[in-house]
UniProtKB/Swiss-Prot annotation:
It holds the Pfam family Ribosomal_S18. Binds as a heterodimer with protein bS6 to the central domain of the 16S rRNA, where it helps stabilize the platform of the 30S subunit. One of its GO terms (biological process) is translation. The keyword tRNA-binding does not apply. GO terms for molecular function: small ribosomal subunit rRNA binding; structural constituent of ribosome. The lineage of its organism: Bacteria, Bacillati, Actinomycetota, Actinomycetes, Mycobacteriales. Transmembrane segments: none annotated. InterPro entries: Ribosomal_bS18, Ribosomal_bS18_CS, Ribosomal_bS18_sf. It comes from Nocardia farcinica (strain IFM 10152). The gene is rpsR1. SUPFAM superfamilies: Ribosomal protein S18. This is Small ribosomal subunit protein bS18A.
């Protein structure tokens, strides 16, 4: 007896939070805003991927630059290893 065809998973695309907020008001990604940046950094200090955060390309790039600048001035930690 033949197998039934597998159902395709429907992936719901996340909307970029910054694009949604920019329509209502001016939103800036600043390296000094560590509470915002910590949402996009894992507990080990790695920058989360776009597919995880749901950001668009431009805002993900802005977050990456802001996190790197924030690390330079010691507001956020660099990537740590588990020991």
């Amino acid at each position: 007896m033949p197998k039934a065809p597998a159902r395709e998973k429907v992936l719901k695309k996340k909307a970029c939070t910054f694009c949604k907020e920019s329509k209502s008001g001016n939103v800036s990604i600043d390296y000094k805003d560590t509470t915002l940046l910590r949402k996009y950094v894992s507990d080990r200090g790695k920058i989360r991927a776009r597919r995880v955060t749901g950001n668009c390309v431009q805002h993900q790039r802005d977050i990456a630059v802001a996190v790197k600048n924030s690390r330079e001035v010691a507001l956020l930690p660099y990537v740590s290893t588990a020991r």
